[in-house]
Amino acid sequence: MVAASGTQRTRTVGLARWIVYAGSVFAGAWLATQLFYLVQIALWSFINPGSTAFMRTDAWWLSHDKPPAQIQHQWVPYDQISRNLKRALIASEDATFATNNGYDVDAILQAWEKNKARGHIVAGGSTITQQLARNLFLSREKSYIRKGQELIITWMLETVLDKERIFEIYLNSVEWGRGVYGAEAAARYYYRIPASRLGAWQSARLAVMLPKPRWFDAHRGSAYQAQRAAVIARRMGAAELPQSQ
């Protein structure tokens, strides 16, 4: 009995050590990942991102098309993007972007209630900064784990970058259709003009597309797009643009 008891204690101690070791490895890997994100964001204070997680995933799929296709993306400076588009996106996606801290608590709570009622994730209540966090580093998968990581990256973005820089990166990286990324590519793809020349109505229609850009690309001129664009156009005058610091 004594020998059996000793063996049991040895096994228990061994299991505890293994759990501590595994936990330490997991924690170390998690911290290393967060540090990687933070360093990347710090570099983007003065270096433009070459691509995003969404772009890289799309590029892989497009390369397997027949015939192979490529990502459409061209970075342009903030002041070369129409103020109409900036106002339309803020009016549509995040009315308090210029003054919030990257989170809209009311929208998050509303999304939580909606998801609970549906039994699965259908809404995220994401601000512009949260959308950027997801586009830069994460996947299109909808899960609470991914949402948690999105919130952490959002805090990093808001802490390290000013609002205008966040918006500049967002404008240059958001998806506007399969393989179409950024304001310049979208303006040329849909209207054959540079982003600097986008008018109010064109900008409002582009803003409507963001929740489901691929669907709207395939269903151009839908009645809903026109109706929603009219609502956004009316709100654009009140949209507050961020100021550089």
Curated annotation (Swiss-Prot):
It is a single-pass membrane protein. Its main location: membrane. InterPro entries: Glyco_trans_51, Lysozyme-like_dom_sf, PBP_transglycosylase, Pep_trsgly. The chain crosses the membrane at residues 13-35. One of its GO terms (biological process) is peptidoglycan biosynthetic process. One of its GO terms (molecular function) is peptidoglycan glycosyltransferase activity. Keywords: Cell inner membrane, Cell membrane, Cell shape, Cell wall biogenesis/degradation, Glycosyltransferase, Membrane, Peptidoglycan synthesis, Transferase, Transmembrane, Transmembrane helix. It holds the Pfam family Transgly. It catalyses: [GlcNAc-(1->4)-Mur2Ac(oyl-L-Ala-gamma-D-Glu-L-Lys-D-Ala-D-Ala)](n)-di-trans,octa-cis-undecaprenyl diphosphate + beta-D-GlcNAc-(1->4)-Mur2Ac(oyl-L-Ala-gamma-D-Glu-L-Lys-D-Ala-D-Ala)-di-trans,octa-cis-undecaprenyl diphosphate = [GlcNAc-(1->4)-Mur2Ac(oyl-L-Ala-gamma-D-Glu-L-Lys-D-Ala-D-Ala)](n+1)-di-trans,octa-cis-undecaprenyl diphosphate + di-trans,octa-cis-undecaprenyl diphosphate + H(+). It is found in: Cell inner membrane. Pathway: Cell wall biogenesis; peptidoglycan biosynthesis. PANTHER family: BIOSYNTHETIC PEPTIDOGLYCAN TRANSGLYCOSYLASE, MONOFUNCTIONAL BIOSYNTHETIC PEPTIDOGLYCAN TRANSGLYCOSYLASE. Peptidoglycan polymerase that catalyzes glycan chain elongation from lipid-linked precursors. This is Biosynthetic peptidoglycan transglycosylase. It comes from Burkholderia vietnamiensis (strain G4 / LMG 22486). The lineage of its organism: Bacteria, Pseudomonadati, Pseudomonadota, Betaproteobacteria, Burkholderiales.
